[in-house]
Amino acid sequence: GLGALSERYDHELYEKAYAHCDVLIIGAEPAGLMAALTAGRAGLDVILADEHDQLGGRLLSEMEHIDGMPAAAWVQAAVAELAGFANVRIMANTTVTGAYDQGVFGALERVGLGVEALPEGLPRETFWRIYTKGAILCAGALERQIAFANNDRPGIMAAGAMRSYLNRFGVSPGQRVAIFGNNADAHRTARDFAQAGVEVVAMIDSRAEAQ
């Protein structure tokens, strides 16, 4: 079952680099963006690192409002403000890989992610050693699947994934959906699908006190 290693020579460039900051913010979901805005406005040297190419995390897939704006519009405004700060560095496509002694963090920046032919001299990846006075972990939450038989069959999805399809990409996972959950996230999913005109045939909540 072992595959064969490629014998082709890797012509890509891989670099290492160093950076220094007052505060390293890991993750650019809502908490990370607010932390970066607060630190940036206070004049601190900030590095905001996120493993995705777009900042905002779950807000890009939600219909909620922040400060009177749709979540995605709020993200755009926040990112635009951060980009205007000379003391804030945004590192997208960057995964913080470890925390070490003396405030040192390792981070892998995938510079050429999604680029088939890189410009000459541009590395495919850069490994950063970041020296910081403090760090804030804002990695977000991970939705836990509910365990039941055959929960990995086609058509069975996590609620967050369904809302990402619907709200972020404009695609419905189906014409008729049944939703099962044990928290308010399930009701949020049912609301979004109903507002989009998708038939919600069942809303099942395991909590006795749910309304």
Locate each region found by the language model.
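Residues forming the flavin
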Residues: G1-Q211
